[in-house]
Amino acid sequence: EEIKRRREEPIDVTGIRPYLEMHPFDIPLPIRKFLTIAVVVAVSPDYVILDEPTAGQDLWGCAQLRKVMDYLQNKGKAVITISHDMEYVAENFERIIVMAHKNVIADGKKEDIFYQKDKLQEAYVKPPLSTQIAQEVGIKKNILNMQELINCYK
């Protein structure tokens, strides 16, 4: 029963069931990433490191990735993500570590990190678009997503 659960649960969590009967070379590349993630979920490590997980993903893939991360976090697993996609980072993580030239140059809450322009530039990343717009129009409040930006004008 435990073996069956450890096999079936990752398949359902990652949303790959429709692709199980396909030849591996016929599976779309973005879905192949989820096959790999399913194996990781089955092994159930304490820490999961995802390197640029949103690269090549469409909206479904990004939403599915969020479900997988929620599942892992609910199981008490630590999820570490390496990403240049700051929209994704702002939406999914509370703590951000910024690295440049093999060194940690900033570490803290996203509300603080995304307003450190010099540190982000040093790491060759930009804050989320909503944060950039808020800064350009002079909104003093920390804005991290478009809904927060829209709410400033209601």
Report the location of each language-model feature.
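Conserved ABC ATPase "signature" region
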Residues: 2-19
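Catalytic Walker B motif of ABC-type/P-loop ATPase nucleotide-binding domains
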Residues: 48-51
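ABC ATPase "signature
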Residues: 107-108
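H-loop/switch region of ABC-family ATPase nucleotide-binding domains
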Residues: 83-84
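A short, surface-exposed alpha-helical micro-motif characterized by mixed small hydrophobic
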Residues: 89-91
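ABC ATPase nucleotide-binding domains
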Residues: 120-154
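Conserved ABC ATPase "signature" C-loop
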Residues: 101-102
